[in-house]
């Protein structure tokens, strides 16, 4: 019996799970097994829908551009893409033509039919597809080809080398898809390889869901941190410095300083000790840590120095990570179990040679400052430390205004290319899963997503427009304690290897800056705002009154000033609304008499005749409590 028979009458089922394997409905069900259905509107169903849509995209491209060569075409979080080698770049007009062809293919109801083939047959059928041949040659698993079969004639209309699974036919894709944009990429992300055209698309289970997504995309353009960074004078990425190297301006520097100061304070409260390490080091350190072997392609090339003291000199590298330095701090003296857990933190700047095509504003840069920490724990305290690190993560992100999360648990696959024993991996994975479940947050599995040196937890945070960002990682490391010979003395006087945990709660300050800028659409909460209070006199006669009042904020380190410009008051107000100032104060004759001010908020609401003491208390409370204030209602809530 196959899946079609088993789920007959279920038009919403598009694939199945059997023995933890995703299968097409055409696959035979092993005797005695009961498959689970995958509905089209489920997360896995949408993944399959998008994967099948990628195949239709490739079929459409090759039917229009006969010389196009196929790369890869996976599904993504909200859509899909496919890479093509073509003679001329695609244009927006090209995408419209391709999308029309896709709809024609979808409506023709071609069947997706999978066939397992041997290597010789795969080579023969893809002899004119050099990139597919490369994939075939690198594949050790079962080789399978998907054929698109004409509904009327039964002839093969198109084929792709693919693991699957796929929808039963193109008809299941429906009309809720769209091609969104195109970019240039290198094959396999390597600049030594040919350049290709990557066509992106999105696909959903309904037209309503598609519209909702496209609306969010348009909203995302409005809050793009690169756009807002320029408009609000926060940062720039000058060509004179180089790709992925950010320059924070005065206002952006204030925001970043506030971010760092508060994070540092919270780390100290949580028992972390801050250390500092240099930006460069000799080659030997990264050979010892394994970074040159495992991470060398993402490191900047070496600098040959010290030829005056050694004829050959030494290779120095910009550091891509802080962890080897922290392990040297640990090993700098004998350690006892009484000193553990040892929590070493550093806001350390690292340098990674990201491909120029992967660089994206502050979200993906070459020079980044991590809120990095490494915890060295005993086996007995490991679970408690991971739990504390996760709780600290959720609490700290919440203080910055992110409060919706899910957790991804990355485990190893069956490749065997991992450090540490099976027992260690099983133990560590069990602990991470237990801590994640105990947190009460939704969890998702990421099989095969672990690094070679240990499993990890990733905290995914939801922003104001519904996007999830990978924020924090808590990563176990079986590698560095072994490579650096780290030991501590236990109660019995025996030497034991510590368990090492990497964790970065923001990922990097640059990326977190980008996330917060988009989350708040540039209207940062008052405690982060570069300018917090601006006072506008109706006439010059009201300046001394406002100067006296504004001076009170200085004692609380609140960024407040009086506007002395001669422009009309409405024009000034419009200007500060555009600059997203949280508190704009206005004072006229009646305010001088009554010791009041008018306070205006970002949404245009205001409070008139507000006693200055009440105004002062409300602004101070808003900043002290790290509350977002956009409206009069928000302000009233802190006064209660």
Curated annotation (Swiss-Prot):
Pfam families: HGTP_anticodon, tRNA-synt_2b, tRNA_SAD. GO terms for cellular component: cytoplasm. Binds 1 zinc ion per subunit. Keywords: Aminoacyl-tRNA synthetase, ATP-binding, Cytoplasm, Ligase, Metal-binding, Nucleotide-binding, Protein biosynthesis, RNA-binding, tRNA-binding, Zinc. Residues 224-525 are annotated as: Catalytic. InterPro entries: aa-tRNA-synt_IIb (IPR002314), aa-tRNA-synth_II (IPR006195), aa-tRNA-synth_II/BPL/LPL (IPR045864), Anticodon-bd (IPR004154), Anticodon-bd_dom_sf (IPR036621), Thr-tRNA-ligase_IIa (IPR002320), Thr/Ala-tRNA-synth_IIc_edit (IPR018163), ThrRS_anticodon (IPR047246). SMART domains: tRNA_SAD (SM00863). Its cofactor is Zn(2+). Its main location: cytoplasm. Zn(2+) binds at residues 323, 374, 502. The keyword Disulfide bond does not apply. One of its GO terms (molecular function) is tRNA binding. One of its GO terms (biological process) is threonyl-tRNA aminoacylation. It is found in: Cytoplasm. Its EC number is 6.1.1.3. It catalyses: tRNA(Thr) + L-threonine + ATP = L-threonyl-tRNA(Thr) + AMP + diphosphate + H(+). Belongs to the class-II aminoacyl-tRNA synthetase family. Catalyzes the attachment of threonine to tRNA(Thr) in a two-step reaction: L-threonine is first activated by ATP to form Thr-AMP and then transferred to the acceptor end of tRNA(Thr). Also edits incorrectly charged L-seryl-tRNA(Thr). Homodimer. HAMAP family: Thr_tRNA_synth (MF_00184). This is Threonine--tRNA ligase. It comes from Tropheryma whipplei (strain TW08/27) (Whipple's bacillus).
